[in-house]
Amino acid sequence: MKGKCIYILSPEPWGTNFVSKHHYASLLSENNEVYFFNPPSNRNKIFDIKKGLKIVDYSLPKGINRMPRFLRVVIQSILAKRLMQQRVLPNPDIIWSFDPYVFQDLSVFNKRATKIYHSVDVHQTDLELFCVTNADVVFSTADLILDRFKGMPTPMFQINHGLALHFLDEDIRPVELPGDSHNIKVGYVGNLNYPFMDYETLYKILREHCSINFYFIGPNSASNLLDKPKYLEDVERIKKLDNVFLLGAKPSSELPAYLNKMDAFLMCYRAEENIAHMANPHKILEYLSTGKVVVTHYIDQYKDRSDLIEMVRSNVDLPSLFSKVVANVEVYNTISKVIARKLYAQENTYTNQLSKIETILKSINSNTD
């Protein structure tokens, strides 16, 4: 994809912590002009991140989404045109939305643009149905999410999460980790205030394995991915354990240096209560890129991939599975297993996913010509 003007509408603002929409924006900016729209706020400005990538801050009046559909579209059309005029934004060729709460009809920016709705999370709102109806194509990282839109005529495709190319870079700078270097090292990447954290199970695992070093990489307070911390007391509780090390948020480009130090990875969300929400976490590929074993709650998209991850159906069984794996970590990290995990991650880079998306877009556009 080259020479295009692309708007990306994100529910998470630009910041240190990257998820799919940030990675896509960064990659697309290498050969296109990308405008990354932060979620609405009281800020109104546009600024450069790097060549080809600008961040757009804007405000929207409250209550628009409670209006009747026809009135909402009229008002959003006026607001979109005003926003483009005030920021001197060029007409987009592609409008790619990850956010169902703003501009459900993307044609308000340009009726001739290709309109993409990309659902990477479960959104509890009927507004998402309008996004699907008005899009030219819908993508999602999980089949379970797409199942929610069954029967709707818009073309839909499951596209796995992507892996940034720097996770495959063999030239990794050395980093020093706190704690006894002889201990098994287990990593976790993500927001410790994520709404679906299973702290009861996590704390049990941490307490039962005091000779293992647990490294938590990611924000443990407010961040660009979550502005209202929920589990501050739980974070403080695990922080007091001698075998727990909170390393804080790290830029995506620095993560490989830390991940490649680990012997295993742990994921511990309340997945059985939120199967669709947990259907395909993006961090899985980052873990698999190291080749090391991943012990996790239930992940529907990987339910048939026991060759890649060690997974439980219920978190009741997670502590015992974790104990089994770390007691025999060398068995779970044989050369053949490591190679298989790495190959899977390499097949799912953002570059490869973007190629799949571009092929789909060409097919859809040719059918509408």
Show which residues each predicted segment covers:
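Conserved donor-binding/catalytic core segment of Leloir-type glycosyltransferases
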Residues: 178-197, 202-206, 214-217
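N-terminal subdomain of nucleotide-sugar transferases
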Residues: 1-45, 207-209, 213, 369
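Nucleotide-activated donor-binding/catalytic signature segment of Leloir-type glycosyltransferases, i.e.
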Residues: 218, 229-256
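Acidic anion/phosphate-binding donor-loop and adjacent secondary structure
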Residues: 126-129, 163-182
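A charged, aromatic-enriched C-terminal amphipathic alpha-helix characteristic of glycosyltransferases
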Residues: 330-364
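Nucleotide-sugar-dependent
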Residues: 15-19, 194, 253-258, 265-286, ...
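Carbohydrate-associated surface elements
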Residues: 144, 162
